Each structure stands twice: as C-alpha cells, then as structure tokens.
C-alpha cells in the first residue's frame, strides 16, 4: 500500500505547481524525506532512553508575524505524543511559525529529554516550487486539547501564502 513512486511524484508536482501540502507529525517525516525538504527531524533516531514524551502538553510560542498565527495568542499549548517531533531548518525557504517553549517546555504530563526540543521549531512553512509544505511537529487536532491549536490547522488549510513570498522566488 501507500502512495508509491507515482503518487509521491504527483504530490511533488502538485506542490511545486502552487499547491499546499499540510503534514502532521509522522507525515511530516514522510514529506521531509520524499520531497527533499530543507528541514531536519530533530528526534528521528533518538532512543527512548534519551527522548520520550508519550503524551504531554508543552508550551508553544507562536510567531505572530506568520500567516498561520492569525487569531492566535503569543503563547499557547500543544499536545506532544509518541509520533510528534521538532524541526531544524537546514536551508533557505523555511519559515518558523511556532516553537516549543524555551527552558522546560513541559506544562503537564511527563517528558524525558524535553530539553532537546526546547526552543525548537514546532510548526514550519517550507517553500517548494511555487507551492508550500506546512509541517506540524505536534498533533493540532487531538481531542479537547486541540482547542488551542485548531486555528493553526485551519489557517494552514484556508489562508494562502502572501503573494509577495511566492512571486518573489
């Protein structure tokens, strides 16, 4: 099953032609690898002895100038589960829309190695051709915890990137 090579090629073509792909958690890992995005998954390959957050609430600092932040406060919460991640931009064309809190981002639950993602990108917009890929490192639609992050997901789906950003490439 899965997309296969033809499906990945079609997805790549869709985004490069001006489409928007929104990927959550583990799907972000797929998008990074399949589309060759200039972003590194910061928790990939870490052992559970070094990093393990099985389902906790972390502080999220929102970059207010991001289009994804429309209607959002500067600080909110995010559900970080077993499939969640953090990102490190590795090239041009990556805009950080939200970061995990600095210091100790843990607000509720428990975490091993949370300092590894403190201050790291949690939500990024990545230019890809004339389109973009929006990568969520956390789950913005997890039960009632998501009331704080639904707007980020809705903004990713409904608000186009500013024309100047796409046209200026």
Annotate the PLM regions.
Residues 1-30, 130, 156:
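Short alpha-beta junction capping motif
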Residues 1-4, 29, 42-51, 56:
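Aromatic- and carboxylate-enriched substrate-binding clefts and catalytic-loop regions
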Residues 23, 32, 123, 157, ...:
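Low-complexity, Gly/Pro
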Residues 149-160:
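Short amphipathic C-terminal alpha-helix that caps PH/PH-like domains
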């Amino acid at each position: 099953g899965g997309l296969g090579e033809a499906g990945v090629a079609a997805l790549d073509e869709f985004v490069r032609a001006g489409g928007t792909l929104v990927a959550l958690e583990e799907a972000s890992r797929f998008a990074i690898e399949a589309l060759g995005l200039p972003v590194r998954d910061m928790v990939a390959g870490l052992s559970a002895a070094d990093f393990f957050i099985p389902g906790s609430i972390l502080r999220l600092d929102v970059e207010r100038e991001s289009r994804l932040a429309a209607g959002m406060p500067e600080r909110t919460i995010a559900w970080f589960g077993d499939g969640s991640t953090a990102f490190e931009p590795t090239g041009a064309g990556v805009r950080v829309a939200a970061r995990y809190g600095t210091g100790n981002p843990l607000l509720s639950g428990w975490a091993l190695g949370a300092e590894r993602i403190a201050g790291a990108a949690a939500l990024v917009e990545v230019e890809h051709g004339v389109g973009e890929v929006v990568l969520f490192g956390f789950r913005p639609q997890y039960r009632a915890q998501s009331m704080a992050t639904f707007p980020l997901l809705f903004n990713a789906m409904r608000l186009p990137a500013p024309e100047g950003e796409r046209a200026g490439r």
